[in-house]
């Protein structure tokens, strides 16, 4: 996204049309002039660097020790230390608040509610996560999400799928605002499911909303054009951070560097082994929202040390050296990765991540155009089998299988449709590729056939979905291909979980009263911003 005002860019482009033949920049490989209608109109647009999106902080990447920096007191052995490198990226300054999520719910209900209320229902957090069998938490069930007293508190009860849907919505709303701000798009506050703005649909030429004006083109055959990815105007997608990104950002080791040396490693997002502020002005104050000990969630009346019985406002306590709040306590946070115990050992040492399912846009079989869902929301039945032993003698007397079904929202009207890459589609060229041969690599090295005891069974083993052989849900493990990692401590956790290297996991359809999320965004181009060396 260019930092130049787009109106200035439009004026420069219009002037270039008149002065194209006078001193235009030329290609270093062909010698032809850029931005010249007489040469076909190939454009080189003015560009400085990526604009920082709303709510984001630039996290300058680098190398660090990914995994355990504290004793493995739970003996999970699931975070073996390993040196990796994380590219620069952006991350939300705070956790997503109740008020921000209510903005999303309001928009979803306004756009889809009249025709497709199920889309709105799917976005609703589970407020019943507050209930406990032997505690009176009904006030949180009734008031926490919607009462203005909690508007600046982190949203909870959101599952992994809902967090991803929020990221997709946020991407479209931010890019829509950019086009309106620059005078290219009509502001239509009454958009419906047929004409709301979608970044992917717009770039695919399938969006049917109201444009205010187009960009001038140097192509004599088409004097005006839509915004393209090559213009650098649109921001990259908001998304969940990867586990490595989250952990890297949480430590904030940029504050402990002298030259290229990291002087001190950290157990928490701050220096030292304690959880109290050593600064003379704030000495003794708790640095994060967590449980200090048995039954002590907030301190003593008259001196509430952490000033929070459950969650705390997203802008509270002290930020780490990247300027990020609550990277230790308050609520744990979803990350993008699928859980496996040995991911830190198996994943690549550059931008490690487990969870790849490679996809491509669906296209019309006749003309190859990108397909957009212009019909109704598409729900996909989500199934896995739970095996329960039969009998009480402890012997192997068979199993009873229950089919557990749930539906996930995979497509809504107005969005580009996607599919997994497949050998069945010659255009995917999987038989010619060297870096991947299929779509699903969630179980690579840990859960696929090659890493299982069924490897010697040959072709029969491949009839089972990846991850279902080694990890048989509820029979031998709670780990499967839809168990995702969440990081950090929370208002319900002891100090051990505030170490960024610790990790836990949960089914992507489940949620907790102490689990929230924050968004991230890819940094394109230089890993440092303007003004940095």
Where are the regions a protein language model picked out?
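Short, P/G- and charge-enriched loop/turn segments at secondary-structure junctions
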Residues: 44-46, 76-79, 473, 503-508
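Functional-site microenvironments in short loops/helix caps that host divalent-cation chemistry
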Residues: 25-36, 58-59, 65, 70, ...
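A short glycine-rich, aromatic-capped structural motif
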Residues: 48-138, 151-174, 329, 516-517, ...
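Short Gly/Pro-enriched turn/cap motifs at secondary-structure boundaries
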Residues: 47, 80-81, 303-304, 313-315, ...
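Bacterial N-terminal signal peptides that target proteins for export
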Residues: 2-10
């Amino acid at each position: 996204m260019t930092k130049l005002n787009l109106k200035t860019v439009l004026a420069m482009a219009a002037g270039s049309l008149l002065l194209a033949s006078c001193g235009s920049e030329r290609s270093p490989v062909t010698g032809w002039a850029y931005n010249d209608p007489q040469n076909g109109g190939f454009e080189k647009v003015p560009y400085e660097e990526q604009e920082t999106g709303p709510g984001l902080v630039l996290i300058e990447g680098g190398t660090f020790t990914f995994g355990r920096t504290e004793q493995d007191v739970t003996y999970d052995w699931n975070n073996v230390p390993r040196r990796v490198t994380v590219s620069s990226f952006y991350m939300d300054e705070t956790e997503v608040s109740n008020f921000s999520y209510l903005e999303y719910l309001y928009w979803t209900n306004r756009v889809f509610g009249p025709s497709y209320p199920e889309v709105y229902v799917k976005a609703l957090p589970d407020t019943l996560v507050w209930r406990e069998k032997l505690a009176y938490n009904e006030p949180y069930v009734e008031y926490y999400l919607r009462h203005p007293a909690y508007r600046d508190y982190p949203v909870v009860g959101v599952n992994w799928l809902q967090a991803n849907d929020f990221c997709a919505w946020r991407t479209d709303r931010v890019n829509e605002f950019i086009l309106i701000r620059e005078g290219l798009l009509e502001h239509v506050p009454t958009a419906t499911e047929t004409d709301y703005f979608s970044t992917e649909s717009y770039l695919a030429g399938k969006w049917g909303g109201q444009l205010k004006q187009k960009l001038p083109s140097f192509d004599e055959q088409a004097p005006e054009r839509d915004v393209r990815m090559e213009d650098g105007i649109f921001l990259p997608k908001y998304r969940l951070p990867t586990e490595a990104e989250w952990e890297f950002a949480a430590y904030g080791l940029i504050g402990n560097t002298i030259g290229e040396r990291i002087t001190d490693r950290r157990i928490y997002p701050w220096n030292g082994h304690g959880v109290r502020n050593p600064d003379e002005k704030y000495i003794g104050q708790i640095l994060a929202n967590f449980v200090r000990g048995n039954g002590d969630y907030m301190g003593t009346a008259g001196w509430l040390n952490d000033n929070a019985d459950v969650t705390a406002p997203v802008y509270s306590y002290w930020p780490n050296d990247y300027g990020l709040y609550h990277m230790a306590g308050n609520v744990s946070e979803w990350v993008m990765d699928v859980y496996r115990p040995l991911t830190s050992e198996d994943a690549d040492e550059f931008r490690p991540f487990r969870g790849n399912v490679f996809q491509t846009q669906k296209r019309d079989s006749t003309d190859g155009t990108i397909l957009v869902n212009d019909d109704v929301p598409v729900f996909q039945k989500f199934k896995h089998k739970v095996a329960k032993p039969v009998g009480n003698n402890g012997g192997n007397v068979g199993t009873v299988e229950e089919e557990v079904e749930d539906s996930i929202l995979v497509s809504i009207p107005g969005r580009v449709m996607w599919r997994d890459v497949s050998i069945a589609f010659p255009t995917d060229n999987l038989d010619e590729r060297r870096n991947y041969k299929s779509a699903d690599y969630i179980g690579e090295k840990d859960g696929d056939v090659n890493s299982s005891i069924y490897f010697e069974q040959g072709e029969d083993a491949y009839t089972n979905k990846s991850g279902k052989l080694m990890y048989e849900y509820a029979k031998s493990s709670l780990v499967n291909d839809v168990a995702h990692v969440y990081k950090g401590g929370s208002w319900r956790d002891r100090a051990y979980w505030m170490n960024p290297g610790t990790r836990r996991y949960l089914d992507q359809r489940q949620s907790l009263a102490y689990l929230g999320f924050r968004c991230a965004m890819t940094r394109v181009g230089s890993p440092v911003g303007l003004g940095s060396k």
